[in-house]
Amino acid sequence: SGLFCAVKVITNIADAFQTVEVNLNKWKPVIPNKKFDVNIRWPEDIQAEQRIFDEKLPAVQEFLKHNKFNEVTHDATNKELGIIAVGKSYVDTLTTLQKHNIVPEKHGISILKIGMSWPLQGSLIEKFCSDHEDILIIEEKGSLVEDQIYKLLYGYSYAPRIYGKNLLSRCL
């Protein structure tokens, strides 16, 4: 898409080391067939914002739709709780459930793994949330994903109850 990008590295990853062999033959990303200028200009011209919103962000959404950065990994049939877990929090969530012998699907828990946290894949979030009455968002310190979900679902008749950074204050 030609957008600026960043990678968030948490302490557990930054303070660890491991040699990893990457096999690029295993992951073949689907690249949308969009024709526009992906080059970054410096200094950027006045039409930059228009290109971002009209061309580049839609290209990112198209890329997300065809590649599994964000996906439902556990899909309960009796959907009581939807958990949206972001990045390393996804692994921590699965570890915690396993430690307490909780099989998500047997307990009515569906889990959506978020690997790319901005911009969120709106259609996937809306579909996942429409199937649940309660959503628990688990992410690191900031509320980047939680805030996006509030904005995505604002005004929808099916909007579930959302618990995230505000969970503790609701319990007290």
Task: Specify the residue positions occupied by each region the protein language model found.
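Flexible, low-complexity linker and terminal segments
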Residues: 1-172
